């Protein structure tokens, strides 16, 4: 019996001495920018961030011009606010496909990933907020024999 206890004690000692996961490294290009792609519905955003004054440019236009609705601008700012980095990074994004809501979600996803490339320590905060998770919901396809994906044609008894 004492032999098993001794081996179990050794096992617990081994578990406590296990090495930690390797630290994530900063991924930055030659110009000092972090790059990431974000996706949402049909939209794909390519996002570059670099230290700056907090200016956000989408498709060569200011964010206030491109996303006129305040809700969409707030959506894009969420990962920066969650990481408490307002006014510290300039964001340049090119986004294509989908509508404005999907594009805003794609830019948000790209900003979140780029922030983790620039500051790997922010990964926990952004992951907890759900900003790093790709929203996989897409439009359901239309089926034959139906008016839309699920809606049937109008039915008449007589």
Curated annotation (Swiss-Prot):
GO CC aspect terms: cytosolic small ribosomal subunit
InterPro entries cross-referenced by the UniProt entry: Ribosomal_Su5_D2-typ_SF, Ribosomal_uS9, Ribosomal_uS9_bac/plastid, Ribosomal_uS9_CS, Ribsml_uS5_D2-typ_fold_subgr
Gene Ontology MF term list: RNA binding; structural constituent of ribosome
Basic and acidic residues bias locations: 21-32
GO biological process: one example: translation
Matching Pfam families: Ribosomal_S9 (PF00380)
UniProt region (Disordered), positions on chain: 1-35
Keyword annotations: Ribonucleoprotein, Ribosomal protein
Keyword match Ribosomal protein: yes
Residue spans of biased composition, Polar residues class: 1-10
Family to which the UniProt record says this protein belongs: Belongs to the universal ribosomal protein uS9 family.
Name under which the protein is recorded: Small ribosomal subunit protein uS9
Source species: Afipia carboxidovorans (strain ATCC 49405 / DSM 1227 / KCTC 32145 / OM5) (Oligotropha carboxidovorans)
